[in-house]
C-alpha cells in the first residue's frame, strides 16, 4: 500500500470553497472550450475576430455542406470538418443603403449591414438567399454547382427586392421553407416593423399573405420556425406549420400576455374569389401550452417559445415535436422542454373553433353551423377531391375563416407536463436538437440543448415506472470560448455531428466522446451514455449491429455490478492510503472529489481497529463538493477517513486519508524564527515555498527528512551540531533545486 506523508510545518493552506445548495441537476461531465478541443472531437470556424452574427440556415447531407448566413457573408462549410475547405461569398449591402440606414437612426454595427437570414435550396444547382440589406431586404440566386466536388460558390444573377421574403430588421427573426420553387416566409414586411405576415412569394401563381392588420390572425408575432408536414397519404393535404409567439390582450384589454402558437396553411391555397382575395383561406392557429401544475392547483406557464425540433418517423402521425420554452415573468425565471405528439396537434386543428361572446369577449366553443368544406381543409385533397382551388370555396367558408381562425382547444404536451424544467439557474435554453439512439437495452432520445451561455447540454431521456419520463445530463460542453448565446443548431445523425452557431462563429461537435468517461468498465457503465459501451478493453462507440455479448452497457440503470463482472470491480473497493497531518486548533481540508457530481459522498471514520462510523457533520466539520473541511482540529478528529462515493447504488472508495493531529505548541516551537535551531530559523529564509516539499521528494526521501528532523530536535542543545546542520541544509537546498529542475523538464512551457 502506497503511503504519502504530508508534513505541515508552516501554516495550513486552504482554498476557499463555495458550497452551493441547488436542487438543479448537474452534468456528469463538464468540458471547457479548451478541454473539449483536447478531446479531438470538435472543430471551430470564424471568418474574423469580429462578431458577424452567424446563423446555420441549411444543411445538405447529400452534398456534404452546411450553409451559413452572417453579416455581409454567405458561407459553405464542409459537413465533415467545418474548418476545411470553407467557401464564402462577400455580399454587403450597397453603400447608399448603408448610409440611408444610418440616417434613419439604425444601429450601424448590428443593423446597417446585409445580415443573411434566408438560405433555401431552389434547385439542384442553385440556392435562394435573402438578407436584410441594411433595412432594405434583398434576395438573389447563388450557384453552388451540381456536385460538392465542383467547388463552385458564386452569385450569378442580379439582386431583387426581398420585401415579403425577409424582415427589414435583422434582429427580428425570419423563418422560411421552399416548396416546389415557391418560398413561404414568416416575417415583418415593412420598415417600421408593424406589418407581420406569413407570405408566399417567388411563385408563378398569385402571391398570398395573411389578412393585414387583423389581430385575430397575427398579433405582434415573433416567428420561431416553419416546417412542411404531411397530413395523410394525399400530398395535396400537406400543411405548412408556422411556430411563433405573439402578444395578446386579456379580456379586460388592459394588458398584453405572450402566448406560444402554431399556425398552419395549405401550400396550394390561392386565396378567395370575392373575399380574402390574395389572402390565405386555410389559415388556422392554436395555442401551444407548456406549463407545470402545482399541487394546490394553479398552473405556472412557460409562455415564450424559443425553438422547435421535429423528430420524424416513418409514420408522420407519430412525429414528435420538441419545444424550448422560457418564462416571460420578471419574478419567476426558468426554461422548460415540452414534447408534443403530432397526432394531438392535428386533433386540435380538427376540433372546435373558438368564438368570442358577451361583453367581456370571453372565448367559448363555437356552437353554430360549420360550413362545408370544413374551414382549413386543403383543395384537391382526400376530403375535397372535386375542388381544385380555394377560389371554388363557398363564401361562407371564407367568411368563417376570416372571423374564426383560432381553435378553441389548446395543444398540451405528452403527459400534460414538461419533460425538463430548469428553475433558478444562471442560464436559459435557446436551441434544441434531438437524436434517436439504439442502445443494448432499448431506444433512447438524446437531447442537445443550447444555452445563452454558449454551452450545449447532452441529456438522455430515461423511462421510469410512472407515466413521466426521467432525464439525465450526460455532458455540458463549452462550444464557444466567450460564452456567446447559441443562435442556431443543426444535427446530423448520419455524420454523428452537431453544428452550432453564435455571434462569434460556428462549432462542430461529435455526438459522443466515449473515451473521456474513464479506462474501466465501471466508469463506462456509470456514464449511461447510449452512444458508448465497454468493449472489454475501453469505453468506445456502441454499434447495435455488432457483437452484443462483448459489449457492456446499461443506460437505464447504470449498474456496473451486473455489467462489469470479471473486470476487477474489487479495485473500486480500495484506494491508495495517504497520511495527512493537521495542527490542533487550526483548520485542515481532506480532499476528495468524485469524478461525477451526480455521485453522493459519505465520509466514514475509523479509529484504531474500531468499526468505521459515519462522520457527523456540524458547524465545525463541513462537507463540500471537493472534500471535508475541519475547523478547529481536535485530537478526537484523528483516525482513518474513508471517502465513499455512491452513484446508481454502486459504491467505491475514492480516498483513504490517515489523519494525524499535531500539537499546536510543538509546531509553534519548531517554526519559531527565534529558535536556536538553525533549521527552524532558516525556514522563513528559504528561497522556495514550504509546500514545494510535498511534491519534491519521494516516499523514501521524505522518511529520511522526517528522521533528520527528529534527530535534530534531540540534539539541538549541542553546540557542535550547528555547523553540521548548516551543511545539511545546503545539501537539502541542492536536492530541492535538482528535483524542481527535473520536474520543470517534464512540464509544458508556459504560454
Swiss-Prot record:
Identify the main location. secreted
Bridged cysteine pairs (disulfide)? 101-112, 130-139, 266-378, 290-338, 514-532, 592-643
Assembly description = Interacts with PLXND1.
Task: Name the domain of life this protein comes from.
Answer: Eukaryota
Query: What are the Ig-like C2-type domain coordinates in residue numbering?
Result: 571-655
Keyword line: Developmental protein, Differentiation, Disulfide bond, Glycoprotein, Immunoglobulin domain, Neurogenesis, Secreted, Signal
| Pfam entry (one) | Sema
Bias (Basic and acidic residues) ranges: 712-731
Q: What is this protein called?
A: Semaphorin-3C
Kindly give the PROSITE patterns that the UniProt entry links to this protein. Answer: IG_LIKE, SEMA
Q: Which GO terms describe its cellular component?
A: extracellular space; plasma membrane
Q: What does this protein do?
A: Binds to plexin family members and plays an important role in the regulation of developmental processes. Required for normal cardiovascular development during embryogenesis. Functions as attractant for growing axons, and thereby plays an important role in axon growth and axon guidance.
Q: Which organism is it from?
A: Pongo abelii
User: Which residues does UniProt assign to the signal peptide?
Assistant: 1-21
Where found?
Secreted
What GO molecular function terms would the record report? chemorepellent activity; semaphorin receptor binding
> Which family does the similarity line name?
Belongs to the semaphorin family.
Give the sugar-modified residues: 81, 123, 252, 268, 465, 585-586
Q: Which residues form the Sema domain?
A: 28-511
Q: Where is this region: Disordered?
A: 712-751
Encoding gene, per UniProt annotation: SEMA3C
Does the keyword Protein transport belong to this entry?
no
Cytoplasm: present as a keyword of the record? no
Gene Ontology biological process: axon guidance; blood vessel remodeling; cardiac endothelial to mesenchymal transition; cardiac right ventricle morphogenesis; dichotomous subdivision of terminal units involved in salivary gland branching; limb bud formation; neural crest cell migration; neural tube development
